[in-house]
A protein has these predicted regions:
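Classical Sec-dependent N-terminal signal peptides that target proteins to the secretory pathway
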Residues: 1-26
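Auxiliary, metal-adjacent structural segments of Zn-dependent hydrolase domains
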Residues: 59-121, 129
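Active-site-flanking segments in enzyme catalytic domains
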Residues: 97-245
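Hydrophobic, Leu/Ile/Phe/Ala-enriched alpha-helical segments that form helix-helix packing faces
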Residues: 16-17, 81-92, 144, 148, ...
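Polar/charged alpha-helical tracts
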Residues: 29, 48, 79, 83, ...
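Non-catalytic architectural context of zinc metalloproteases
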Residues: 25-74, 103-106, 173-186, 219, ...
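A general structural signal for short secondary-structure junctions and capping/turn motifs
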Residues: 3-7, 93, 195-196
Length: 245
């Protein structure tokens, strides 16, 4: 009788562990980011949202830093973020390896502020909810493209992309090596949507993708941009033929 009773207790404990939502260490085991708690896990496209309950540092040199936000700021930005990310179906997100969204503020890498940090290996996107409101929605999709690009490097060939530009144009070797940081959309594009588009090929692709998602097209009188938009559309359709811009 005692044996059966102990077995029953173990069974109840096992069931409790299985149905209890992930917290603290369990979240860390999932995505290797400390100090997180659940914000929302019951979403239309099954994305799981976490928030920083206290500041965290990441990376081998601990040079990725993000701070915790207050509840009002989280609540205000969550609806906006969720609205934008609901543009992506669960099927598409699964194909590009994105499952987790981390919300925090004052995100930086080696002292350089950034809107987001994508990690397709950990299926995670960290977003700075205090990033400039003027660009915030658009940069969400910019960061989504980096997840896509990292998951499908073979589709987004940078040499092919570079060939669309004027022959005398050269990108920087890295986005942080460039002083071209402006995010305002040009009135007169000449092959590039923003100053930041001119930093690297991958940033240029991300800017074109984010503008397409945000329903901003400047390619009518710009043959270079027309080629770039077609390239993005065609290769996204190879990932998911049902994807709609």
């Amino acid at each position: 009788m005692i044996i059966h009773y102990m077995y029953l207790l173990r069974l109840i404990l096992l069931v409790f562990i299985c149905i209890t939502p992930v917290h603290g260490n369990s979240i860390y085991n999932l995505i290797k980011i400390p100090n997180l708690e659940i914000y929302e896990i019951n979403t239309e496209n099954r994305l799981k949202y976490f928030y920083a309950k206290s500041s965290f540092r990441l990376g081998v040199q601990k040079n990725i830093i993000c701070e915790n936000s207050n509840k009002d700021d989280l609540d205000n930005k969550y609806n906006l973020i969720n609205k934008n990310l609901n543009k992506y179906s669960h099927n598409f997100l699964k194909k590009i390896s994105l499952k987790y969204i981390v919300l925090c503020e004052n995100l930086s890498i080696a002292g350089i502020n950034t809107a987001g940090i994508p990690d397709n290996v950990m299926k995670t996107l960290i977003l700075d909810i205090k990033f400039d409101h003027k660009y915030f929605e658009r940069v969400i999709h910019h960061e989504i493209f980096h997840i896509i690009n990292d998951s499908y490097k073979e589709l987004f060939n940078e040499e092919k992309w570079t060939s669309f530009n004027n022959k005398n144009f050269k990108y920087s070797t890295c986005s942080t090596c460039s002083k071209k940081l402006g995010l305002d959309t040009y009135k007169h594009t000449n092959g590039f949507l923003t100053e930041y588009s001119q930093s690297t090929a991958s940033e240029d692709m991300a800017e074109v993708f984010s503008h397409l998602i945000y329903k901003i097209s400047k390619s009518k009188n710009d043959p270079i941009l027309k080629k770039k938009e077609t390239f993005i559309r065609n290769n996204i359709s190879k990932i998911d033929k049902n994807f709609k811009f």
